[in-house]
Amino acid sequence: MKLNLKKPLVIFDLETTGLDLVRDRIIQISYIKVGIDGSEKRGDHIINPGIMIPKEVEELTGITNEVVKDKPNFKMLAQSLCNEFEGCDFAGFNSNRFDIPMLAEEFLRVGINFDFSKCRMIDAQVIFHKMEKRNLAAAYKFYCGRKMEEDFEAHRADQDTEATY
């Protein structure tokens, strides 16, 4: 895909031991760095978090404590990731609310102050939520497979209640 970029773009995703930015750790970082010339560089790292991976995370990701035991920790990868990401913009799904803050926290934890304020952040989830309707009619169509107006009068409390039921 040809993108019109002013700066390289890093499309990335993280897998973590949980959702807490302070207590949890990254166990996988995967990225595609797209250059302004359209070149692509891919990276994928399994990371030893230094803490136990909860069973539910192991089941969800397939990344187990056994898998990470001989992998590098984040500190071992941090400087090379910092160098790779320097001068780039970032994109992901739910990245503005989770992945960017988690990555920033991991960098700070190992003494690297990566300045995300100079980067554009493109969150595909935000775009999706703006492009797709997020109302009762959209939910009704998604869950019931029918248009709400075929079954109910919208914007009538009694009808909206029935549709929700």
What is each model feature region?
Residues 1-118, 133-155:
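Conserved non-catalytic scaffold segment of RNase H-like nuclease domains
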Residues 156-165:
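Acidic, divalent-metal-coordinating active-site segment for phosphoryl/phosphodiester hydrolysis
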